[in-house]
A protein has these predicted regions:
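S-adenosylmethionine
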Residues: 1-449
Length: 449
């Protein structure tokens, strides 16, 4: 094994440690490690695979490790994470033989600990190599088995089964273990999709047109952020489900639009690209996040976005009543629809978090509603699949605001491939539906008096 690969595995342990101890986001930590250590494409891929894979399958790995680790409570966390990443490679990856994985783990243990730790790591992994892991069929309770087999907390599996049934829950849990495609949105102000596909192919990337969203391209090989076309502002990294929001909002030409929870700016810039003389007022609570919106707008060559640092629950203090043609509330949420991109989410969220978020979502909708013109459209969206944050928040909004009604034209504004998922004025996309992020969109019209 080369030194650089050894370092990759040590970095994976570092990331897992920070995720567990500091509640850090794995995706941000990974990007930081990759940049800091100037990893090659191969090592970048290996670090991402080991880190995400171990987090995604943490509960399964712990189930496998339990019979072999005598004193889990007194095992140092970095040692246990080293065992996790090693077992992940032994069970789920086949390019490196077990003896090499064990050797590498022991070397890391020697470097970071003492002889007793390296002996323990060697003993645990060699015992697993000889005996194999216990079968998941030993778990008799079906819900518990599904939870451990797919590494989703049992409370969450039970909640989804109650909301959607066993089959849909099982499908969702299974797909959450897979890696998502990188998808980009073409900046049609600058270039056509066909032309961008040609340029990216010439740069050596493997790409294909999305069959779901007309301005989307899927990346099959490479990272398009490193392309010249990205630097030139020809595209934005954005999931296909997220792109549906701008279609749902349907802002065109000279519309005045409020994006009340705008950072990091993917939907903001998408809306702005579809306008001519109109403008997007983009709000976010944090200054550093508003700077991200400005940075994206500048890269894309968009001058019709005005940014504000503010709490959108106080938005009535900043804007006049009935001043916007379109309002988007892409609300803060539990993020349960994007577990493939942020696998640590499933271990950090709780039932109480969902209750608190639903309350914030309600406040955001209530604050923005008076700012919409009569006949205008309000779109509420989240990247979660939980009914308490989605359908229930949307239904309750209508009950509190008799001056609003369901927007039954939502379906016809969306791309044909997703129209069948619309019910009334709501769209719920599950990760397994289109191999995209889980997403919810609902649309309301303000009645004309």
């Amino acid at each position: 094994m080369t030194t650089i690969k050894k370092n990759v595995r040590e970095l994976a342990v570092d990331v897992l440690e920070s995720v567990e101890k500091n509640q850090s986001y794995s995706n941000l930590l990974l990007n930081s490690k990759i940049e800091k250590h100037n990893l090659s494409g191969v090592d970048n891929g290996l670090l991402t695979e080991i880190t995400y894979g171990t987090i995604q399958r943490k509960m399964t790995l712990d189930y496998y490790l339990e019979p072999f680790v005598r004193d889990r409570k007194h095992t140092l966390s970095w040692v246990y994470n080293l065992l996790r990443i090693s077992l992940y490679q032994m069970v789920y990856l086949d390019k490196v033989p077990d003896h090499a994985i064990i050797y590498e783990a022991v070397e890391i243990a020697k470097k970071r600990g003492h002889k007793g730790i390296s002996s323990m790591v060697n003993g645990v992994l060699r015992n697993i190599q000889r005996q194999g892991v216990r079968p998941l069929t030993d778990i008799k309770d079906e819900t518990e088995r599904l939870a451990i087999a797919t590494s989703h907390p049992q409370w969450l599996v039970e909640r989804w089964i109650e909301q959607y049934g066993v089959e849909k829950t099982s499908e969702m849990c299974e797909i959450n273990l897979t890696a998502p495609l990188q998808t980009v949105r073409v900046n049609t102000r600058k270039i056509s999709r066909d032309e961008l596909v040609r340029l990216l192919t010439e740069e050596g990337f493997a790409v294909e047109k999305s069959s779901i969203v007309p301005e989307a391209i899927n990346c099959l090989r490479g990272n398009l952020v490193h392309s010249e076309s990205y630097t030139l502002g020809f595209m934005t990294v954005q999931d296909e489900s997220s792109m549906l929001v701008a279609h749902a909002l349907g802002a065109v030409e000279n519309d005045m639009v409020l994006d009340a929870c705008a950072a990091p700016g993917g939907k903001t810039t998408h809306i702005a690209e579809r306008l001519t003389t109109g403008q997007v007022s983009a709000i976010d609570l944090h200054d550093h996040k508003v700077k991200l919106i400005k940075k994206q707008a500048q890269r894309l060559g968009l001058r019709n976005i005005k940014t504000y640092v503010a709490d959108s629950r106080d938005v009535q203090q900043k804007f006049s009543a009935e001043g916007f043609d379109r309002i988007l509330i892409d609300a803060p949420c539990s993020g349960l629809g994007v577990m493939r991109r942020k696998p640590d989410i499933k271990y950090t969220k709780s039932k109480n978090d969902i209750i608190k978020l639903a309350s914030i979502q309600t406040e955001l909708l209530d604050a923005a509603a008076p700012l919409l013109k009569q006949g205008g459209r309000l779109v509420y969206s989240t990247c979660t699949v939980d009914q308490e944050e989605n359908q229930r928040v949307a239904e309750a909004f209508l009950q509190r605001h008799p001056d609003f009604e369901r927007d039954l034209e939502l379906q016809e504004r969306l791309p044909e491939g997703v129209q069948s998922f619309v019910e009334d004025n709501m769209l719920q996309i599950f990760p397994q539906d289109l191999d995209s992020d889980g997403f919810f969109i609902s649309s309301f019209k303000k009645k004309s008096q």
